[in-house]
Amino acid sequence: MSKKATEFQRKAMSWMYRGKEIFKPLNTGWIDENVACVREWVANIFFYRKGDTTIMVDAGYNYDRLAEKMGWLGIDPKSIHHILITHQDTDHVGAVKADSPGLFRNAKLYIGEIENRYLIGEARRKVIYHLYKLPQVTIYNEKQLLHDGEVFDIDGVRIECFLVPGHTWGHMVYLVDEKYLFTGETLWFGADGGYSFISSLAEDNKLAGCAVTGGAGAETARTWAASIFHHRSHGMDGQFCLCVCPQRQELFTIQKTST
């Protein structure tokens, strides 16, 4: 994402959601002994550390101060060999784009097979005015394509993949070591409790409807999501996420992070 496009998106998104109290990123720092984050304006990049391995979750904007802030955490960009990508929006892949400073040129990207279709130009987002017409993203990193329900290992770190289409067709959520759920933009919290991000930016809201109406445990998930968000009208994202694997609801710890 070019610097000009980055600045446009940052300003446009801030204007669109003014008053919603929806952008509440965590400040740069360690959240616990395993998870840290870097704040980039209204977004977060997350890091999961286990032993000598540090895995990055999403790549944020094309952000000038990323290396500096990683230094605050004691993380050398050269030590990042694995990056989990939830989806290819330009505020999630900016640091691995071809026109980025190249901090992570040697890192392997893990991305859903469906979401990868955006990267290679097979799929495009709907255009609403101009804002949601995503530019073609060029990435040269090695990629491993993932599928719903896939479980794989990175240096002793267990990663389970859940496909949650709606925000994008191939949005992927990652459950790491059966303890940490990295949701990308599946769950947003606003001033009114929960915010239906799917209904505002979804390519096809029918996807969300299918997720919350079909399958065993769907009604339980709807009720559970409503209790989290307090307002049924704003609970779509929570219902969507929980219906991915309703029999394992105890694993879906809701954290107040925006991106």
Name what the model sees in each region.
Residues 2-6, 10-13:
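Eukaryotic low-complexity, intrinsically disordered regulatory regions enriched
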Residues 34, 48, 58, 87, ...:
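Divalent metal-coordination and catalytic microenvironments
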Residues 55-58, 79-84, 161-163:
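Short catalytic-loop micro-motif centered on adjacent basic/acidic residues
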Residues 63-65, 71-150, 251-257:
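Active-site HxH/HxHxD metal-binding segment of metal-dependent hydrolases
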